[in-house]
Amino acid sequence: MNTFRTTALMAVMIVLFALIGQALGGTGGMLLAFLIAVGMNGVSYWYSSSIVLRMYGAEEVSRAEAPELHDLVDRLRRRADLPMPKVCIIPQDQPNAFATGRNPDNAVVAVTKGIMDVLDRDELAGVIAHELAHIKNRDMLTSTVAATLAGAITMLSRFALFFGGRDNNFLVSLLMMILAPMAAMLIQSAISRSREYAADREGAEIAKNPLGLASALRSMERAAEHRPMPANQTTSHMFIVNPFSGGLSGIKRLFSTHPPTEERIARLEEMAGRAQ
């Protein structure tokens, strides 16, 4: 399913670029836009992991440097029947985490310094298991391509505004510039929300402790309000909790890249109740 979803996102980006290129520059513009879109898809597939890690200053740590974290990841990845991912630490105080990589053999689990300080071992196990569930389901490439598509839509809207030409085209381009970021966020949220619920459920199964993950989500959501992290909007959906704010309400929920944390916690608590 995720392979189909990723392919569809790549195809959407190519078609979007080609259509805008055709509108702005005829056949030549369409060909140029097509080549740019193919190039962006290639970069997204092969290099997105290193780009995202560099963006957040994540550094790979060895077992000698972080033995407890490595042991925890190793124990849980064996339980999930996965290859050992690289382990990275992000130098940020906000407790958060994400997984990246184009497939399980090239996966990375990145956690912030803050998560090591705030969460206890059971909570951290829940978070790591959640990220391993993303790896097992091959969610990382889908989320990365979604981030690329979101950035591409925004870039196209700005490009169209400056090269729109006539008044009618200018008005259309201006409208596109206003609506395109909303469309990009809706694409991200539609993909991210279903991914997060599934990773919560499967992560709780891997860790064998739904309440540990529920407690972690509650602590991270609370900390996000008081420990801001410089994050990029196009990659915010990759994190286990929204890095920009604690609670969301009203219209913000529609465009949020994450499901409501209280709903995620409620589902995990219900899951724990059924297991008793």
Swiss-Prot record:
Organism whose genome encodes this protein: Salinibacter ruber (strain DSM 13855 / M31)
Enzyme class: hydrolase
TM stretches of this protein: 14-34, 145-165, 171-191
EC id: 3.4.24.-
Binding-site residues, Zn(2+): 130, 134, 196
Highest taxon of source: Bacteria
GO MF: metalloendopeptidase activity; zinc ion binding
Membrane topology: Multi-pass membrane protein
Keyword annotations: Cell inner membrane, Cell membrane, Hydrolase, Membrane, Metal-binding, Metalloprotease, Protease, Transmembrane, Transmembrane helix, Zinc
Gene Ontology BP, a term: proteolysis
Name listed for the protein in its UniProt record: Protease HtpX homolog
NCBIfam families: PRK03001.1
